[in-house]
UniProtKB/Swiss-Prot annotation:
Membrane topology: Multi-pass membrane protein
First-level EC class: transferase
Organism for this UniProt entry: Neurospora crassa (strain ATCC 24698 / 74-OR23-1A / CBS 708.71 / DSM 1257 / FGSC 987)
Biased composition (Basic and acidic residues): 94-107, 169-187, 549-558, 1220-1235
Primary site of residence: membrane
Catalytic activity: [(1->4)-N-acetyl-beta-D-glucosaminyl](n) + UDP-N-acetyl-alpha-D-glucosamine = [(1->4)-N-acetyl-beta-D-glucosaminyl](n+1) + UDP + H(+)
Compositional bias ranges of the Basic residues kind: 19-28, 188-199
The protein's name in its UniProt record: Chitin synthase 4
Biased composition (Low complexity): 648-665
Amino acid sequence: MSLPRRPGPSPPHEEPRRYRQSGSRRSRPPPADVETGYAPMAGERPSQQQRVPSISSFPETLPSPNPNVERDPLAPTPEPAHPSGIPQRKRSLIRPERNRIGKDHPNYHYRKHAANMNTLPSSTGHDPIYEDLEGATDDVSGTGSRNDDDVSEESPPRRKHSTKMQVIETEKSGDERRRRRKSDTTKHGKIVKASKGKREKSGGLPTPSFWNIYCGFVTFWCPGFVLKCFGMPEMAQQRAWREKMGLISIILLIMGFVGFITFGFTQVVCGKPPLRLRINEVGSGYMIFHGSAYDLTKSHHPPAEGIPRRPDGLGANVIYDLPQHYGGQDGSFLFQNVNGKCKGLITKQENSDVPSDKSGNLAWYFPCNTFNQDGSSKPNTTIPYYLGYACHTTANARDSFYLGLKSSADVYFTWDDIKNSSRNLVVYSGHVLDLDLLHWFNDTQVTYPARFKELRDKNTAGNQAIRGRDITHAFQSSKDKQIAECFEEIIKVGSVDTETVGCIASKVVLYVSLVLILAVVLARFVLALIFQWFISKTYAAAKTSQTSDQRKRNRQIEDWTEDIYRAPPRLPGEVGSSVAGSSDRQSKRSSAFLPTHSRFSTVYGNERGNRKPGLPTTMASQNAAGQLLHPGTIYGQGNESRSSFLKSDAYGSSSSPADGPGPAGFIHEAVVPQPPSDWMPFGFPLAHTICLVTAYSEGEMGVRTTLDSIAMTDYPNSHKVILVICDGIIKGHGEEHSTPDIILGMMKDHTIHPDDVEPFSYVAVATGSKRHNMAKVYTGFYDYGTNSAIPLEKQQRVPMMMVVKCGTPAEASKSKPGNRGKRDSQIILMSFLQKVMFDERMTELEYEMFNGLWKITGISPDFYEIVLMVDADTKVFPDSLTHMISAMVKDPEIMGLCGETKIANKRASWVSAIQVFEYFVSHHLAKAFESVFGGVTCLPGCFCMYRIKAPKGAQNYWVPILANPDVVEHYSENVVDTLHKKNLLLLGEDRYLSTLMLRTFPKRKQVFVPQAVCKTTVPDEFMVLLSQRRRWINSTIHNLMELVLVRDLCGTFCFSMQFIVGIELIGTLVLPAAIAFTFYVVIISIINSPPQIIPLVLLGLILGLPAILVVVTAHSWSYIIWMFIYLLSLPVWNFVLPTYAFWKFDDFSWGDTRKTAGEKSSKGGHGEAEGEFDSSMITMKRWAEFERDRRVRSTYWAGSRDNVISGVGGSNGWGSSQPRGHEQGRHFDDYFSDA
């Protein structure tokens, strides 16, 4: 955050850092330069640095730590002073926090919000310590003085009160600053309006994106008027349809590419390989000539000596019709390649009978006889019938062989054949040469070089050096190369067993894909086991109200999930129960009446030395441990939200002449008292948690069991509060009362009578007139009911708040008034937390929420660190909340987590039965694997937990997580005009929130905690399942498209979460094609032989590993049966549901998932705009301004504050009911409480 820091090294922050100036520079007033972001303000203390808007396009940016810099590092690049061609200074390597950032930067909105917070610089460079401040001057820069008489003697030694004059001066300076901001804002508003008018005047349409051009090209065959005829008259509907067709075309292309790689790539690059016959396996129907096999079974030789004509008049077949059978023999010497490369090397011997011409061409080199293919034939120099018999030297005979016959196969040698010691073989340029054939030379007929003899004789050194090897590289000299090329023509007997480049590439692609898929599958399995056996245990609480025997606990959970209304095996007992005063049966006033401190109690709570070293930091433990720092200082040096809520000046007094009754008016007498900060019933410091329940159309039984399960969790009631947000006044299908009325009946001890609660305005996540919405805030405590199954002695007092979105008066007559969607319900809380943390302007609704939480808990809302999000039809196991908070507290880097969701209606129908194992695998395989890297991509909205803020760096420093402005800003996006945004924000808002968290904080963790369990009912009708999975699949695709672009996730290249996300995205898109290919491979493997082993092995691994996971993780054996049911339903999961979801890309409704009374189906969802938004209907002020107005009104009705104080007695007449815990009793004068 934009806060002063302690000197020395500190861990890196996600937020921008503030660098201190030197003391001399700090003592000088900053220059009045708008570019630097500073400007002196009238009436402002020199120690207070206030930022003013810049004239640049970034009106609110971080100020430069150096006043001499030319401009703000966040401001856009200015135009050159001399546009005459002088080159501008290029970007250089600078600090990350000084980089220029755009709106796409993950921390853009956070830096803007942090830049608006006041910063009090330290004169020493250290955090301000209160004892030092007591003796210091008001002006930390040393330009002013302070009167000790201004400090009240009755105030605690940590407090410092300003005089009345200082308060007036502070208010004047604040008014002056507000006037300046208003003037600057107006100025900027005029600029924006002028530029907007200029754009409208130009009349230019926005340039269509490449995506829109592509979608238009794909759907050119369907013009707009045709779509109007098919029920799509609006441009938004037509655009969504065209984008859907564009996405489907891309999906088909990806499917085609996967199919091509699987089946077609080998056929294209390798083709059908020619027939190849291994040496010594050439059949009797072939003869070998120069390394190629010829099928001569149907050939006929012209009549010749020794080859008579057959009775049918045809020539004899040399394979079968002759006395000597030549089938399977090598006849290379019958058609010798002469007078080529060997000319000049092999010459005629004197007195030779070999015919020749004047050019030295010879008729043959070897005797014209055949030899065996295995090399066992001895040289045969006999000549039957006549000289040149069977040498085929005539042109007719040569043409008949070379032109008339086609080789049927290539004869190949493996390297084992080549290295066979019984043969004398070498390889040259891929051809196998038989050196033993050189023995067939008739020395009386021809002459040849002595080198021939050296190479053919096995006992020579030359032969031993090359036999059985490839001599291509060795025979590169001109003489040796000529000899090798000669051998290639006359003694070639075959070729090496090699493949073409295409076939090699095909195998490379096949095996790389195989290794990649196997690596991913096995890595997911192994790492999921490692998480289950080792990592997950570090997250769990050491002890809870349930059994510590893991096997017994698993059995109890399985029994508990058999029925949605079944009670847990054991209700919370002594372990985890709150301190005295938390039970409904105890006195409501005991905690406020009995003293909790004596004169011997330390003013700072528990001594720091009593705390165990290395304990995690929480809001409660931090404020108790800070002996020197102000207990209320949460964000350091006046930037804490609570103190800024209650004082307009960081060092000013909490009172002013206009003060009236304190915040919230009073604190409920039945508030659960806060235990000591060192009380750790579960072995870790407790953290305050908001249990958010979003309700829509649930019935009484569903809501009752949900709230019962949350109220009866063993986590202390002092540190949890139930917040129910009803999404409109909705009556569920078949219900007598609306959901808000049902939930209101589950509350008691209201702070304000329900009939007196008024609706308050807020800015909803919608467009048009729906952006203005109204809601009512009901606060009190949870009522278990008169007929509750929970024993009275077990019922604990749990504070509860309900926010009912009732809508504006204009929509009171509509079917679903106030309904804005679940995302809007979540934004109500997230925006409220952000404004509490940053002390920003809030709506009337948020102001009432602030006061309501104060009334029923006795603590400020900024004490809450964690939010549990639960749907109103989800039931939580008693110790689940404890396990989840344990993980959050033990590891501050965890920003979100989820538990396991189990199905309570397993046997309702075949539809629910096929989902059991799918839920199991998604948690214990997918989420467990992702948890190893801290990157769970989907935290289910029905049961998950997020961190509101996290401790960072030195003590009293916190950074917003869920309350981060970037998360809130993107999640509250109301301009949903593209198919991508609609699938993200209207259908899968829960998953998109997980994506936003990972995108904003890629270095933090989102994990799965298997010890936390909930149960819910799943669709038991196929059409409802179809509608639900349509939303989930489409949301998954679009969220993975967002997440695959995040480059800062864990890992690098193939060993990264980004790569895994990309694999998941492609796998989701090709699911229909994958299941079709699987069936094809299985059928082909059954029909044809041999079967395709590799695809079958992959299929067995993918389907079989989850079964092994069930066994080794000691889960119920019943999941084996559920697995077989799941395997039988694979066509539904992988073909029917994805295909339907793809075709319904442009359907943004929730379909049949949750029915309401009188609801009509609509494809638009909550994104449909109606009317225009009137912002004047919504009042936004800072909390202090709201509280000042309320106190003025209270003073008007109740009389002056002095009369009230004199009637009660003491310096603080409102302190008789101060809440105990977290040392609030000692610094309660920070709050204007009149409890």
